[in-house]
Structures are given as C-alpha cells and as structure tokens.
Amino acid sequence: RHIERCALLLILVDMAGTDARDPRDDYKHLLAELELYDKTLLKKPRIVAANKMDRPEAKAELAKFKRRYRTVDVLEISCLTGDGIERLKKELLKRVTALRGREKVSRRADQ
C-alpha cells in the first residue's frame, strides 16, 4: 500500500542483462505487475535508474532500452562504483518536491 502514496516511482533496472535477462523485458514485466496491482500506478510519474552502467555490455543494452521506451526518463547509475547516485538523489528530490507542491495547491483548490 505504500506505493499508492508515492508521488514518484523509481524503477531500478539491471542494464547489464545479468543472467541473460533483457532489461527491456524486465521493465515491461515490472509495469505489468504494477498494472495488476493497481492500474492507476501506471499514471504516476516515474524514473528508471539504469543500474550496472559500470559493466561494458550495459551501454548497448541502454541504447536498445531507450529506443524502445523513448518517453521514459532514464538516469544512469552504478551501485557498485557509486557513479550517478548523487545525480539520481538530486533529481528525485527535485521532482518529489515539485510534485508534492502541486498536490498541496490542488488540495487547497478542492477545499
């Protein structure tokens, strides 16, 4: 139920395709699971954190991912090296702050 209260969804995707997985399919399956739980979750803003970008194969997989999901916001990170984590944190703070501000304005207008 916590997910229903989230202003923004962060979806972590293994871009290295570990264990012969396809990051595009993993993302598609995650969206399908969200839809099964509650279709309105698909309307929430989201960011994909493209993890394992320190791995050589991740760049090619990321390019394929971006071709399929052109409108999805993707930030590159590596949990192993820490690359991109600060940028991701700043982006999350910026977006959640903006979304929460809009929610407050909307609630005031409804009263």
Annotate the PLM regions:
Residues 6:
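An anion/phosphate-binding loop that grips the pyrophosphate of nucleotide cofactors and donors
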Residues 18-111:
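C-terminal-of-GTPase-core extension/linker across diverse P-loop GTPases
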Residues 13:
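Oxyanion-binding "anion nests"
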